[in-house]
C-alpha cells in the first residue's frame, strides 16, 4: 500500500507510462500493445503501473483526453486572430481529428476505441458537451447542459462513423470534410449559408501540417500536464 501511495503522488511515473503507451499504440496498435510491454518500455514496475492504470482502456482514456486538449490548443494558436468565430474553431478542430485518424491506421484504432469503450467515450462526451453549449447556444436556445450532453452522443456517433471509414479514390478527404461538416452543423441547426461558408474556409487549411504539429507536440504536452 505504501508503494501505491508513493506512486499516486509521483506524476513522473504516470507521465512516463502515458508517453510510452502513446508511442507503442502508434507503433504497434492498441490491440497489440500489452500492459507488460508498456511497463517494460517505460521502466515502471508492472505492479506500480497496474496500481495507476488497472487496464489499457484507462490509459487510452487519459491519452485521448490529452489528445483532444492538444488538438484544441493547436487550433487555438492557428485561429488566434479569429477567437470569436466559435463555429469555425469547432469545424477546424473536428476536421483535424478526422485528419489525425486518416494519417495512421493505429491512430484510427485509438479513436475508434475511445468512442466505443465506456470509460473513454464518457471522457469524450463530458469533454465536448460544455464546448457544444458554448459554441452552439445561439442556435439551440432552448437547450440545457443535459441536452448538449445528449447532443454530443449523437455527434459522437457521426464522428465515430466518419473516423472508422478510411478515404479512398471515391470517398476523398475533401468529400469527407464536406459530408461530415454538413451533417454535424445541420444537426446543430446552423443555417445553410453559414455551413457553406464554414466548409469553404476549413478547406483552405493545411491539415497535414496541423496533424504533424499536434502529434509532434503531444509528448511534451503530456509532460506539461502531468
Question: What are the residue ranges of the model-derived segments?
Answer:
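Helix-loop "lid/cap" segments that line or gate small-molecule binding pockets
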Residues: 95-102, 113-116, 184-187
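Helix-turn-helix
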Residues: 16, 24-58, 62
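Amphipathic alpha-helical packing segments from all-alpha helical-bundle domains
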Residues: 113-163, 174-179
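Hydrophobic alpha-helical connector segments
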Residues: 62, 73-107, 127-129
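Short linear capping/connector segments at secondary-structure termini
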Residues: 76-79, 110-117, 200-201
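Preference for well-ordered, secondary-structure-rich cores of eukaryotic proteins
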Residues: 43, 62-67, 150-151
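Short, Lys/Arg-enriched anionic-surface-contact patches
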Residues: 5-13
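C-terminal peripheral helix-coil segments that are non-catalytic and often amphipathic
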Residues: 133-142, 168-226
Amino acid at each position: 500500500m505504501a508503494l501505491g501511495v508513493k506512486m499516486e503522488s509521483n506524476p513522473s511515473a504516470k507521465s512516463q507510462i502515458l508517453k510510452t503507451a502513446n508511442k507503442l499504440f502508434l507503433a504497434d496498435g492498441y490491440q497489440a500493445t500489452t500492459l507488460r510491454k508498456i511497463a517494460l518500455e517505460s521502466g515502471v514496475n508492472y505492479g506500480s503501473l497496474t496500481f495507476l492504470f488497472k487496464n489499457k482502456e484507462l490509459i487510452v482514456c487519459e491519452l485521448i483526453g490529452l489528445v483532444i486538449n492538444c488538438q484544441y490548443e493547436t487550433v487555438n494558436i492557428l485561429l488566434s486572430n479569429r477567437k470569436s468565430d466559435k463555429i469555425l474553431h469547432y469545424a477546424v478542430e473536428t476536421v483535424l481529428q478526422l485528419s489525425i485518424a486518416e494519417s495512421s491506421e493505429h491512430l484510427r484504432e485509438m479513436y475508434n476505441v475511445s468512442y466505443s469503450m465506456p470509460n473513454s467515450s464518457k471522457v469524450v462526451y463530458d469533454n465536448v458537451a460544455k464546448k457544444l453549449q458554448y459554441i452552439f447556444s445561439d442556435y439551440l436556445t432552448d437547450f440545457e447542459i443535459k441536452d448538449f450532453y445528449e447532443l454530443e452522443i449523437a455527434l459522437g456517433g457521426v464522428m465515430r462513423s466518419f473516423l472508422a471509414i478510411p478515404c479512398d479514390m471515391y470517398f476523398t478527404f475533401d468529400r469527407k470534410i464536406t459530408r461530415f461538416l454538413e451533417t454535424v452543423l445541420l444537426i446543430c441547426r446552423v443555417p445553410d449559408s453559414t455551413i457553406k461558408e464554414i466548409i469553404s474556409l476549413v478547406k483552405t487549411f493545411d491539415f497535414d501540417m496541423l496533424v504533424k504539429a499536434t502529434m509532434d507536440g503531444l509528448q511534451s504536452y503530456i509532460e506539461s500536464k502531468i
